[in-house]
Amino acid sequence: GKMTATERGRILMRFGELIVKNAEEVAQIEARDTGKPLSVARADIVAVARYFEYYGGAADKVHGEQIPYMNGYNVNVVRVPHGVTAHIIPWNYPAQMFGRSLAPALAMGNAAVLKPSEDACLSGIRLAELAMEAGLPPGALNVVTGYGHEAGAALTAHTGINFATFTGSPEVGVLVHESTAKNSVPCVLELGGK
């Protein structure tokens, strides 16, 4: 069934708490998987928890609005989830990108499919396990691992995707954009962020 925004918010807040509770474990995974210093990985995990705490608190604060038009007419703006969202994230900040990309999508009631980099996917898998432990229903968050030219290409070409986001190189961003455009799927690209 449909979950209310308040229920979603509570789950995401619980998820943030679980990230804090398991921060050292997830930071160790992140440091080993990416090769970054443990001190940096620890800071990244704090940021991930904050994303879910923030968007958990925002989940029931986003509403439609009524805009006066003319002669007693109003325009009603209704905010609805996209549906199924695809999130392709890079290797260099997988945990932070997990939070930055998925927290707002889940808070607004979307189902999400995460495709982490084949070079650093372990923190995303562990965080998804914690999300389930926090109460996220089965199917709300899915993790697909594999190579970009296989798993990523299949994800962006899938007709069941309603929105996509990609962070990575301009060359791959063009491929993602072309693939999603074939199905008229909106796509947000963050390219060459170095």
Segments predicted by a language model, with ranges:
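Short alpha-helical
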Residues: 21, 25, 36, 47, ...
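Residue-level signal for inorganic ion chemistry
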Residues: 8, 30, 52, 109, ...
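Aromatic/hydrophobic pocket-lining residues that form π-stacking "cages" and hydrophobic walls in ligand
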Residues: 26, 52, 101, 127, ...
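Glycine-rich loop-to-alpha-helix module at the N-terminal edge of alpha/beta enzyme cores
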Residues: 1-62
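Residue-level recognition of specific faces of alpha-helices
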Residues: 11, 18, 44, 51, ...
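Conserved small-residue-rich beta-alpha loop and adjacent elements
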Residues: 65-139, 162, 184
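Conserved NAD(P)+-binding/catalytic subdomain of aldehyde/semialdehyde dehydrogenases
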Residues: 84, 117, 133-194
